[in-house]
A protein has these predicted regions:
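N-terminal leader regions that mediate targeting or early regulatory function
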Residues: 1-186, 198
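Amphipathic alpha-helical/coiled-coil segments positioned at domain termini
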Residues: 188-191, 198-205
Length: 205
């Protein structure tokens, strides 16, 4: 994600009203206030990716193998319930999801749509000022996920993020975020994607 867009999301998160803050607590995203202040160690992340074995799905450090299990991340985050692994479909129609999740009419959704996602700048510019709109909390959650937990393209939000929003109030998204992060490492190692998809913050932890 481009730095300018990330700064816009951070500014939006830091200036949210009571409705936005209540919704962040409801979907377990209150931590975003602190996460946005974490400085990424890019040298560390590049080094970590070099040690990732995309065939065996382990990190190789000398003769040691480290497999990042969900339970290990759960212990760090004090989470023990991993009943379901959430991997939303990646081929959903972004225009239909924009209408379903954010009540964006089809004619506008078609302008926002970008292949398998939609324009992140447009979402942030529209909803960061529309605090009275019914779907404002959901839009804020999408921006938080896109900016800090399910980072992907430089200016496009993947439909995975849209599809996950409907599950946030009843399911734990950590398994999905971890899965997307490890898949992102795979795609980088296999040269399938020029940028990393997933959570830089989770990987750094």
């Amino acid at each position: 994600m481009e730095l300018y867009l990330l700064k816009k999301i951070s500014k939006w998160v830091s200036h949210t009203n009571d409705v936005g803050r209540d919704h962040r607590r409801h979907v377990h995203l209150s931590c975003i206030i602190h996460y946005r202040q974490v400085k990424l160690n890019l040298h560390l992340l590049r080094a970590v990716s070099d040690f990732w074995d995309h065939v065996c799905h382990v990190f190789h450090f000398n003769r040691c193998k480290l497999c990042p299990m969900m339970e290990e991340f759960g212990a760090i985050m004090r989470i023990s319930n991993f009943d379901q692994i959430l991997l939303p479909p990646k081929h959903a129609d972004p225009i239909l999801l924009l209408d379903e999740v954010l009540s964006i009419p089809y004619r506008f959704g078609s302008l926002w749509s970008m292949n398998d996602g939609f324009d992140s700048h447009t979402l942030v510019d529209h909803f960061s000022k529309a605090v009275d709109e019914e779907c404002y909390p959901e839009a804020l959650a999408i921006a938080a996920l896109d900016g800090f937990f399910l980072t992907g393209d430089f200016f496009k939000t993947n439909v995975v993020v849209l599809d996950a929003i409907g599950q946030m109030d009843r399911e734990n998204l950590v398994p999905m975020i971890l899965g997307e992060t490890l898949n992102g490492l795979d795609e980088v190692k296999e040269s399938m994607c020029p940028y990393f998809k997933g959570s830089h913050l989770l990987l750094q932890v």
